[in-house]
Amino acid sequence: IVEEESTLNQLLADFSAIPNTSESDFVKDEYFQACKELLESDELIEFLEKKDMNFVFYPHIEMQKFVHLFASKSNRIVIQDAGSAIVEDLLLNSSILITDYSSVFFDFAYMFKPVIYYQFDNGENEQATNKRWFNFEKDGFGPICKHGTDVVKKLYELKDVHLNTQYQKRVNDMFPVRDKNNSERVYQAIMRLEKDETR
């Protein structure tokens, strides 16, 4: 989990993958249509202009083969290919995350940054990504949207790109220890396991 924090005036959109799909099927898929709707949204562009923000769209590594199919109408929207980006840098340098079910939302929440879930598929991809153990309605770290227009509305509702009280509590419940000693704790846990195995 990312422990550093260095935020730019940038939105990050990162969505999970659709397994085993062809390009011809992908362009017909709800996933493509929903992402396209958001990327081409005049309301989103207006929001970015008003807030002087940039928007980085970073498809899942398995979806990067389709990155050429996406386009934007504004120089404030960047379609990011994996070859010229490091995921950790995108997480650190973004102040808001828009995602469907991608587990990067845990990293974002750990840094106490706002998350907006754009779950346009009525939970279908949730099953495919094995997130059945996580209840987004009950445990999620941000609002759930079904349409691109709803995402933009939620962006406007954010206050100074901070989590509201409801989601702060959920983050604290999920991550009761928040410091810079995670690596040390993992190391000590591994050492204890090794010691137990040698007994």
Report residues per predicted region:
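Conserved catalytic-core segment of nucleotide-activated headgroup transferases in glycan assembly
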Residues: 1-70, 145, 182-184
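A generic local structural motif
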Residues: 41-43, 83-85, 103, 130-131
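Catalytic binding pocket for nucleotide-activated donors in carbohydrate/polymer assembly enzymes
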Residues: 68-74, 103-174, 178
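Surface-exposed, flexible loop/turn segments at secondary-structure boundaries
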Residues: 2-4, 63, 85, 123, ...
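Donor nucleotide-activated moiety binding/catalytic core segment of transferases
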Residues: 31, 56, 61-106
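CheY-like receiver
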Residues: 47, 90-93, 154, 189
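C-terminal amphipathic helix plus adjacent low-complexity
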Residues: 15-27, 53, 146-199
